From Swiss-Prot:
NCBIfam families: sensory_box
PTM annotation, UniProt: Autophosphorylated. Activation requires a sequential transfer of a phosphate group from a His in the primary transmitter domain, to an Asp in the receiver domain and to a His in the secondary transmitter domain.
Reactions catalysed according to its record: ATP + protein L-histidine = ADP + protein N-phospho-L-histidine
Primary role: Member of the two-component regulatory system TmoS/TmoT involved in the regulation of toluene degradation. Probably phosphorylates TmoT via a four-step phosphorelay in response to toluene. Can also be induced by benzene and ethylbenzene.
Top-level taxon: Bacteria
One Pfam entry name: HATPase_c
Name by which UniProt lists this protein: Sensor histidine kinase TmoS
Biological classification of the source: Bacteria, Pseudomonadati, Pseudomonadota, Gammaproteobacteria, Pseudomonadales
């Protein structure tokens, strides 16, 4: 017979082809050829071999099954006439063209549809190729056809294209919605500016006409003006955002003195700094001329300073420095002594609508747009902004702006801006109101019997407004957040709690929840005042915990009316509860107990009835057998499933005991387990055992046995649940047999790979035997014969023949077909044989082999041949990995030792190869998983099977220094 010796052609220009030479196959290769055929037919994908004219020679079994044909039907016939291509005439003609192209020497590869599933009735898509194979004279002698099923891939690609199209449509829709939102903001902002102008203008006229701060209405005018200015600032911000989103925001460059601008802006915060005892340090040079948009520069400084004042505690320090930075940039730094900004939030604070939630700060006020506007204004100037830790703690903002406008930009010569006039800059737009005296969390001295009202509101202006509305008729005290309110309520419970929802430290809904958890506050009515139009939350709070919910803005008259109703209901409820508590508590208590006892009895009867119904349903319909026995193991009842499993009828089982259904060799153990169960008083146990059926067969089962709690005056009953696992046991035995056959096949394949090395190892002692035999003949033929030299030659012949015999013994033992034989293993002999096998392949691949075995190795039970196969597989993997890369030093270390507790053998195979990627370590031992270009990916899976047969473990590691380590742990006897 002939075989193909495949090797790459010497002519490098002939890509995607192989050279072959024909030779006579030795009979020793028959078995290997059979194994190769098994592997060929076992391939899942399409593989076929054609002659040079495209006629079928060989096709693997998976491809034949897919088309519903046999090899005999198509062998010797044109490949394009086979069942796979009979989709249409075009498919047949196309395949014929592909075969002709490959026959002319062209490598063909394309995606194509074939009849390759359900016996040729279903079309699948395959990645198809035809590879020309040449002989040593460059003549094409074979065509290798290969195909990989890519139907799922094609479907996934089509689905991905559809999803991408849907995503593009969604992105376009979002873009349109975003543009519509920006247009809406711009239009609404324009519409709001008109009524705000009509509020602020007349208000300013009225305040000028009043007699200064001595007027009784002056404070109310200030509140109106301050909040109107705040609203105007938010409107302007929204308008700026709309312009920036529409890319319509431009810069009006002017030559300005940044020192003067910054000095004027910072001076407007002097009054606020004095109120809060904050030191404002403005370190500015005499002059620093730059070309900037003065209005936007002012907004940058105002936002940074107001942000610093928000988070700086009373008595703190704020620094505002301006300096020249090279090349040609101005550097503005604003730092504070507040809590600072965590590292992980420093990018987020410049995002729109992001607010920094710091404990104790009013995080819920504002829109979260200030720093976003600052960043966008800075970037419009082609500058940068960053945040870091201030030297003494707190936050440090650094803004770097170029001194000169971009080339070609128009720059006005006048350096004036509206910020040059201190009267036009209003920092109140950017700061939270400063709490006035008496507006904090204080417990007043209650002087009368008027109802008490606790107001919880974080905005000082709103807090003062509500207090002024109610202080005439009620004793009012206030708190800025939920935590302070709880403290005040514990000291002086109110008759009514009025709370906002969005507050720092503790929100209003959290406060409501905590108040309702305390029994002493159960009868206190709660009113929510909120600007949050959340209908779902409003309904939830009204249905569960609060008595009223009023949306801002509201009128003072409506507030007084609602408060009056709640206070009246509270007073009436208190009076009624006091009256009821004076009635006969003994009768009420007795009635309550009787009702409760009757209710418990009814519930017990209902539960008992339901439990019995559920038990009956489980008993009759369970797939597992259920048996009730007495303490002597006599069968009292058996459900239909147990009758079906054993083949006995209910009448038959009533005459039997579980002991009679148990095989004789298991009865003693069964009696002992039952005795321990009765002695322990109910400790359930589970066991795998077997039972005798009526037809004489034996079944395997998992049995769970426990004691049932007996009713009064009833005997003890034992519950046994029998789960039939006979089919599972048979499947496991079949699986074990298949695994052993796979191990044997792998062992033969491994020895096939070693054939050349083994031949070399045997040839060496045989050559030495021939040499020494010739020498001995000459010594004996001398006159006189040289007996001493002849004896030494004979001794060397004996030594070399022993060496060859050892190799042959090792090979026969390794290839011996038998199941695993567990017996004590001679580890020293195993190590010696393994070293002998690995010596030749290590040397031929330039690998330094180092085998280390401890002096005292643990005694283990196992199959020595399988353990040796496991180690050889791991070692050959390492040798192959190192030979495929350019390692400077190729070292393979095998170590055999005990673990720390001396109860297991640890085998370590370590190499200096390329190592194993972390994402592949978890998949290495899966069947058919491989990182090689060739191979089935079964080697490491077989190693895992061998380790598990010996109750051991195998795992891989990739050390930081490089290479790979495989560990095997086999427990002692």
């Amino acid at each position: 017979m002939s075989s193909l010796d495949k090797r790459k052609t010497q002519n490098r220009s002939k890509k995607n082809s192989y050279s072959i030479c024909l030779k006579e196959k030795a009979s020793a290769e028959l078995k290997r050829e059979e194994l190769a055929r098994i592997i060929f037919d076992g391939l899942y994908e399409f593989v076929g071999l054609l002659d040079a004219q495209g006629n079928v020679l060989e096709v693997n079994q998976a491809a034949l099954n897919g088309a519903g044909v046999t090899l005999e039907e198509i062998r010797g016939k044109p490949f394009w006439k086979a069942r796979w291509w009979q989709i249409s005439k075009e498919s047949v003609a196309n395949q014929k063209r592909l075969v002709e192209a490959a026959s002319s020497g062209e490598f063909v590869r394309c995606d194509i549809e074939i009849l390759g599933k359900s016996g040729g009735r279903e079309v699948i898509a395959v990645d198809f190729s035809l590879l020309p194979i040449r002989d040593e004279q460059e003549n094409i002698v074979f065509l290798l056809a290969e195909g990989r099923n890519i139907t799922d891939k094609k479907k996934a690609e089509a689905m991905l294209a559809l999803k991408n199209h849907e995503l593009e449509q969604l992105v376009e829709r979002i873009r349109k919605l975003d543009n519509a939102k920006s247009d809406f903001f711009a239009k609404v902002s324009h519409e709001l500016r008109t009524p705000l102008s009509l509020i602020l203008g007349p208000l300013e006229t009225i305040m000028e006409a009043e007699s200064g701060r001595g007027s009784p209405y002056w404070k109310k005018f200030e509140v109106i003006q301050r909040n109107a200015m705040t609203l105007l600032k938010q409107v302007n911000t929204l308008l700026d955002l709309a312009k920036m989103d529409a890319q319509q925001m431009g810069l009006s460059y002017r030559r300005a003195d940044l020192s003067q601008l910054t000095r004027v802006i910072s001076s407007n915060f002097d009054g606020i700094a004095q109120q809060k005892s904050i030191t404002l340090d403005a370190e500015l040079p005499p002059h620093l001329i730059a070309e900037v948009d003065c209005e936007k520069y002012e907004r940058i400084i105002l936002n940074l300073l107001s942000n610093a004042f928000k988070f700086t505690p009373d008595g703190g320090l704020i620094r505002c420095h301006l300096s020249l930075s090279q090349p040609a940039h101005a550097l503005i730094t604003v730092s504070d002594s507040g809590p600072g900004i965590p590292q992980n939030l420093r990018k987020e604070i410049f995002e729109r609508f992001h607010q920094l939630n710091q404990e104790g700060q009013q995080a819920n006020q504002g829109t979260g747009l200030g720093l976003s506007i600052v960043k966008e204004f800075v970037e419009l100037h082609h500058g940068t902004i960053s945040v870091s830790d201030a030297p003494g703690g707190g936050a440090l903002f650094q803004v770097k702006l170029p001194l000169n406008a971009p080339e070609g930009a128009y720059v006005a010569n006048n350096a004036m801006s509206r910020s040059d006039n201190p009267q036009t800059v209003n920092p109140d737009e950017y700061l939270l109101p400063i709490p006035t005296a008496g507006s904090g969390a204080e417990l007043p001295q209650f002087q009368s019997d008027q109802p008490r009202v606790l107001i919880v509101e974080d905005n000082p202006d709103m807090r003062c407004f509500i207090r002024d509305c109610l202080s005439t008729d009620y004793q009012v005290y206030v708190a800025p957040d939920g935590a302070k309110a709880l403290e005040l309520m514990c000291s002086a419970p109110p008759d009514l709690l009025i709370t906002d929802l969005m507050m720092p430290v503790m929100s209003g809904d959290t406060l409501v929840h905590k108040v309702r958890e305390k029994n002493e506050f159960a009868h206190i009515p709660i009113m929510v005042l909120s600007a949050k139009p959340d209908e779902k939350l409003r309904v939830k709070l009204l249905s569960e915990s609060v008595q009223d919910y009023l949306l801002k803005p509201f009128s003072a008259h409506e507030l007084r009316a609602r408060v009056s109703n709640l206070i009246s209901m509270k007073i009436a409820g208190d009076a009624l509860r006091k009256e009821l508590s004076d009635q006969s508590n003994d009768i009420a208590l007795l009635t309550h107990r009787l009702i409760k006892s009757r209710h418990r009895l009814q519930q017990s009867n209902i539960a008992l009835t339901a439990s019995e119904a559920r038990w009956k349903a489980v008993y009759e319909n369970s797939a597992a057998g259920i048996v009730l026995t007495d303490t002597e193991n006599r069968i009292l009842n058996a459900n239909p499933a147990f009758q079906r499993i054993t083949g006995y009828t209910e009448k038959d089982l009533a005459q039997l005991s579980m002991e009679q259904l148990t095989p004789p060799n298991e009865r003693t153990q069964m009696k002992q387990r039952l005795a321990r169960l009765l002695q322990s008083g109910g400790a359930e146990y589970s066991v795998e055992c077997s039972y005798l059926c009526k037809n004489g067969s034996t079944i395997w089962a998992n049995a769970s046995v426990s004691l049932m709690s007996p009713r009064v005056d009833e005997p003890q009953v034992i519950l046994q649940i029998i789960d039939d696992i006979t089919e599972k046991k048979q499947a496991q035995e079949t699986l074990n047999q298949l695994q052993q056959e796979l191990v044997q096949v792998s062992r033969s394949a491994t020895m096939g790979e070693f054939a050349a090395y083994i031949a070399h190892e045997i040839n060496q002692p045989l050559s030495a035997i021939m040499t020494n035999a010739n020498a001995g003949t000459r010594w004996i033929g001398n006159e006189p014969p040289n007996i001493m030299e002849a004896k030494e030659a004979l001794a060397r012949i004996i030594r070399d023949s022993d060496r060859a015999a050892d190799i042959i013994r090792m090979v026969r033992s390794f290839l011996k077909r038998q199941g695993p034989v567990l017996k004590p293993i001679d580890l020293k002999a195993l190590v010696a044989d393994t070293t002998l096998i690995l010596k030749a392949p290590s040397q031929s691949n330039g690998v330094s082999l180092n085998v280390i075995a401890g002096d005292t190795l643990p005694a283990i039970m196992g199959d020595a041949v399988q353990i040796q196969q496991l180690v050889i597989n791991l070692a050959m993997n390492s040798i192959e990995a190192m030979s495929q890369v350019g390692c400077e030093t190729r070292q393979l270390a095998l170590s055999f030792s005990s673990n720390a507790s001396n109860d297991a053998l640890i085998i370590c195979v370590k190499d200096t190869g390329p190592g194993i990627p972390e994402d592949q370590i978890g998949q290495l031992f899966n069947a058919f998983y491989t990182t090689k270009k060739e191979g089935l990916g079964m080697g490491l899976a077989i190693c895992l099977t061998i380790a598990e047969v010996h109750n051991g473990k195998i795992w891989a590691e990739s050390p930081p220094a490089g290479g790979a380590c495989f560990f095997v742990s086999i427990p002692v006897s």
